[in-house]
From Swiss-Prot:
PROSITE patterns in the cross-refs: INVERT_DEFENSINS
Positions of the propeptide segment: 20-41
GO-annotated biological processes: defense response to bacterium; humoral immune response; innate immune response
Gene Ontology CC annotations of this record: extracellular space
Name listed for the protein in its UniProt record: Tenecin-1
SMART domains given in the database record: Knot1
Keywords annotated in UniProt: Antibiotic, Antimicrobial, Cleavage on pair of basic residues, Defensin, Disulfide bond, Immunity, Innate immunity, Secreted, Signal
InterPro entries per the UniProt record, alphabetical: Defensin_invertebrate/fungal, Scorpion_toxin-like, Scorpion_toxin-like_sf
Function: Bactericidal protein produced in response to injury. It is cytotoxic to Gram-positive bacteria.
A Pfam family hit: Defensin_2
Nucleotide-binding as UniProt keyword: no
Source species of the chain: Tenebrio molitor (Yellow mealworm beetle)
Family: Belongs to the invertebrate defensin family. Type 1 subfamily.
Signal peptide segment: 1-19
């Protein structure tokens, strides 16, 4: 019983120490200045797959463009999504 209580108290203190914020953490202003990376090729590179004879070549790009209010889209030679 004493070992169980000791283990619970030790876990509590370890979790409390881990929950403290780091003093070196970046502020919101530092993050906004240039930490964002925008990859425009993700719909054409990663989501253009073929599985069991079904090809989803430009379907993700077309769905992305339809979601943005365009009439569709395609992947160009550089594998970048181009909306119509």
């Amino acid at each position: 019983m004493k070992l169980t209580i000791f283990a619970l108290v030790a876990c509590f203190f370890i979790l409390q120490i881990a929950a403290f914020p780091l003093e070196e953490a970046a502020t919101a202003e530092e993050i906004e200045q240039g930490e964002h990376i925008r990859v425009k090729r993700v719909t054409c590179d990663i989501l253009s797959v073929e599985a069991k004879g079904v090809k989803l070549n430009d379907a993700a790009c077309a769905a992305h463009c339809l979601f943005r209010g365009r009439s569709g889209g395609y992947c160009n030679g550089k594998r970048v999504c181009v909306c119509r």
